[in-house]
Amino acid sequence: METEQDEVAQDELGPEIALDKDPFQLTVEDVYDISHIVGQDLLKISREARGVSSLVSDLQFKIVRVLEMLEALVNQSSLSAEELKMERDNLKAEVERLLKDGPQMGVGPDKMVIDLTDPNRPRFTLQELRDVLQERNKLKVKLLVAQDELQCYKSGIIPSPDDQIVTLENESMITCSPRENESKEKSTVKSLFSFKQGKQT
C-alpha cells in the first residue's frame, strides 16, 4: 500500500525526485527519469548556444554512457536484493518446516544424542563396562594367586610341579588340562574387543 502511495507522490513531483533519492534506493525507472532530465537540460543548452552544439553532443554521448553504467548497476543491485529476499523467504520456510518436524524427531528426556564423529563418544554400554571391570578384577585375583604360588615354589614351601607330573604319569591318570577349558571359554574382554574390531573392519 505504501509503495502505491510513493508512486503516486513521485508522479506528482515529476522526474526531478529521482535526483534527490539515496543512490542505494534507485530503481531502473529513476535512472530513466534522470536520463530524461539530463536530456532536457542538454536540449536547452544546445538551443541557446548555437556554437557549442558539437561540444554538447560530445558531452551528451559521455552522459549517455554514464547513465547506461548507472542503469546496469541499479539492475544488478535490484537483482541481488531480490535474490536475497528469495533466499530469506526460503530460509524462513525451511526453519518453519524444521520447527514443525522438530518435536517428532526430538530426543526424549531419557535419551541422548551421540555424535558419531566425536572421538570421545561413549562406545560401550554400562553393562559391558561393568562386565569388563568384573573380568579385570577376577583376572587380578588370579594374578595375585599365581604370584603367591610362584613365590611359594621359589621358597620351596610347595614342591615343584615336575614331581607331581611324574606321580601322575605313574598313576596313569588322564585329566583334561585347565588350559583347554580356558581356550574354549572366551573372556568377556576378548569377546567385547573382537566384536568391536569386527565392527570397524
Curated annotation (Swiss-Prot):
- Which GO BP annotation is one of this protein's? protein transport from ciliary membrane to plasma membrane
Going by the UniProt record, its keywords in alphabetical order are: Cell projection, Cilium, Coiled coil, Cytoplasm, Cytoskeleton, Protein transport, Transport
Q: Where in the cell is it found?
A: Cytoplasm, Cytosol; Cytoplasm, Cytoskeleton, Microtubule organizing center, Centrosome; Cell projection, Cilium
Entry's transmembrane regions? none
GO MF annotation: an example: protein dimerization activity
Q: Which residue ranges are recorded for the region named Disordered?
A: 177-201
- Coiled-coil ranges per UniProt: 67-155
Tell me where it mainly resides.
cytoplasm
The similarity annotation says:
Belongs to the RILPL family.
**Job of this protein:** Involved in cell shape and neuronal morphogenesis, positively regulating the establishment and maintenance of dendritic spines. Plays a role in cellular protein transport.
Q: Which PANTHER family match?
A: RILP-LIKE PROTEIN 2, ZINC FINGER PROTEIN DZIP1
Name of this protein = RILP-like protein 2
Quote the gene name from the UniProt entry. rilpl2
